[in-house]
Amino acid sequence: MYKFYLITFLLLAGTIAKVSACTNFLLTRGATQDGSTMITYSADSHVLYGELYHWPAGTWPAGTMMDIYEWDTGKYMGKIPQAAQTYNVVGNMNEHQLAIGETTFGGRQELWKQTGAIMDYGSLIYVTLQRAKTAREAIVVMTDLVEKYGYASEGESFSISDPNEVWILEMIGKGEGEKGAVWVARMVPDGYVCAHANQARITTFPLEGKTSISSDRMKKIYDKEVTTVYAKDVFSFAKQKGFYPQEGKNSTFSFSDTYAPVDFSGARACEIRVWAFFNAVNSNMAPYFDYAKGHIQRDEKGYATNRMPLWIKPDRKIDVLEVMDFMRDHLEGTELDMSKDPGAGPYECPYRWRPMTFKVDGKEYVHER
């Protein structure tokens, strides 16, 4: 059967002014009706407008340099060597049907700034699309770029997909005084779906072995048995910074809970979008609704203990029209359905043109979204 990749762009992210409104759904071949891999990518805002970028394929002489401009602001970041061959890119997919999307999770603020870093998250996406053919090669390119030229953005979750595989890569910079980033990448098992929406989602992961490698053995990533890859210093850097106990076991280390701990807004405003998608395709998600509403249980390390799984197996095969509907979900049918409250007006509008939070007598409250 002819393999093809389908990516749904409901709204491409333009200049984003600190909004937490991006959502990605990731679907493997075995989870879809037509055997396609799919990812979605939205920047949900009434003041952002869709756009498509185009980079034609090219062959470049040795010594050619390319300018890097920060995607969000247009700020000049620096130069990096151009690849000898670049691929045709339209939007967030290239001629080899490699596609990349993202949502910003932020994470620990002391890791956001890295003086001299060149590669911001947007440039990382579009440079990689010009240089890689597959999801695995994209992970190599992305992690190599930040190691060589530094990482100039907040923490990011990336969706990376080709016609055969879907991966989630989560990355956060090392802050001032060090170049690069720490990261973990995991392949979504075939037949499963995954999602992220401005909250880091990778928790514990398999340690180095047959199916998992650190970046010390990056060449092994092309072995199809490998389904997890992580930065060689992802544990030691956290211990060095005091984010994880020196005596802490690597086997119980959670990337998200260490580098981007989930709080009330991370659950109620972000993870709840993941829950809505999972709930639409799997009948066993009700126990996680309390967590998605912001009621987080924690262990002695401060790790959340009632989080949703990173991926789930849907009850049925999913088609692209359903995926489009899932991206339009407003928590209909739940107690948080805003189309049914007085503010919805006669047309049951689920939107409210207002900030997400407000204060009364010094106490902060949340608006639903």
Residue spans for each PLM region:
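Sec/Tat signal peptide C-region and signal peptidase I cleavage site
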Residues: 15-21
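Mid-to-C-terminal functional-domain signal that highlights helix-capping/loop sites
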Residues: 288, 292-327, 334-337
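Short, well-ordered beta-strand elements within core beta-sheets of diverse protein domains
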Residues: 125-131
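Substrate-recognition/cap regions that form aromatic- and gly/pro-loop-enriched pockets
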Residues: 336-369
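A contiguous strand-loop segment
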Residues: 22-121, 141-299, 306-310
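Sec-dependent N-terminal signal peptides
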Residues: 4-13
